[in-house]
Structure formats: structure tokens, C-alpha cells
């Protein structure tokens, strides 16, 4: 079974790792797509990302649970990736429950992962306020 996850994965933290481990446990192949630098800046502001897309992709591909990882520049590219791989399950954070999910029409099932309270934005604020 193919499992799909997408996200920014800017400063990798325990919450990311726990979600990716959970996702891998659902199937045979874990496929991940990460937002490009341009997209992260558009979504999160001019000071982001902290880590560039090549480094973020390297970090994600280095994880034992991840079988492949792509970078996408737009919602249209993300839909194309999802449509092409046709994942059996897409894993999203629980904050996406009740909201439209990009590419969901190309997945057999959506699973929601309950966040542990970790976040890159919280980490950045904590560091900045020291």
C-alpha cells in the first residue's frame, strides 16, 4: 500500500517524526511531498523557510520511514503528484479535519494524525524570544 504525506517540514521536530513513523506503519511505501521555498515564503512569510528546499528534501529522504520525496511549487503540482501516485492513504494533521484536502479525490482514504503540540513556528518563536 502507498501512503502519502505532504508538508513544509522546515525545522524537523519530534511531531514530524512521529507523524511520518505513524504514516509508514499504515503501508509499504511512504511517499512525501514538500513545499518549495517559494511556496513556503508565500504561505508563512518572508523569513521562512529556515532550511532551503534541497536541505529539507535531504532530511526527509534520509529518514528510514520515507521511500521517496518530491518538491512541489503549487497546489496544481501537488494535485498532479497525488493523481500520478494514487495513494491508498493520505495522512494529514488533525487540524485538517472538516476542511477540503487538496488531491483527496485521488486517494482511497484520508487518515488524520493527532498532533503532539510540536510546531516549527512555535520553535522559531521560542528561539527568537530567548
Which role fits each region the language model picked out?
Residues 1-130:
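Nucleotidyltransferase catalytic core that binds NTPs
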Amino acid at each position: 500500500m502507498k501512503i502519502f504525506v505532504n508538508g513544509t517540514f522546515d525545522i524537523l521536530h519530534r511531531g514530524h517524526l512521529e507523524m511520518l513513523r505513524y504514516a509508514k506503519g499504515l503501508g509499504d511505501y511512504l511517499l512525501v511531498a514538500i513545499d518549495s521555498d517559494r511556496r513556503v515564503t508565500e504561505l508563512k512569510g518572508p523569513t521562512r523557510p529556515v532550511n532551503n528546499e534541497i536541505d529539507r528534501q535531504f532530511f526527509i529522504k534520509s529518514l528510514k520511514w520515507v521511500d521517496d520525496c518530491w518538491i512541489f511549487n503549487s497546489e496544481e503540482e501537488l494535485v498532479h503528484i497525488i493523481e500520478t501516485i494514487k495513494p491508498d492513504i493520505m495522512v494529514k494533521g488533525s487540524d485538517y479535519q472538516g476542511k477540503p484536502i487538496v488531491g483527496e479525490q485521488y486517494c482511497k482514504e484520508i487518515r488524520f494524525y493527532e498532533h503532539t503540540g510540536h510546531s516549527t513556528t512555535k520553535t522559531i518563536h521560542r528561539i527568537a524570544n530567548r
